Amino acid sequence: MNKKIIYCDGTFDLFHSGHIQFLKSCKEMGDYLIVGVISDENVLSYKRTPILSLENRVTILQHIDFVDEVVANCSFQPLSKDFLEEKKIDVVVYASEDGQPHWTDHYQEAIKKNIMKFIAYGKDNLSTSKIIEKIKHI
């Protein structure tokens, strides 16, 4: 039996329950979950410096029992056809507040292959940015 392989990527900074909800949603779509962790340098190209180091973020994800594989130092360049084929990825998942397509340039190959799924954040709509804003106002 072939396993259905799911891929998602993100910064996963200040890991919180919203991340868990997202990863569980991804895992429920298939049998094997690969999580890419965007490198610090690449994160800087679209938002602030991560609070936690790449090593810390990867370690957290490696200790989640339903995450099957963690790919460290992912580039936020477009996902390549080679990467999708090498990992035999069946579905690529991206979550946003509204569940609408964002970062479509990054996911162009997955969109072309019709394996892209955009979903909304979990029920608590929690994000690292919201946590940081809350801390600033304490």
Positions of predicted regions on the chain:
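Nucleotidyltransferase catalytic core that binds NTPs
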Residues: 1-138
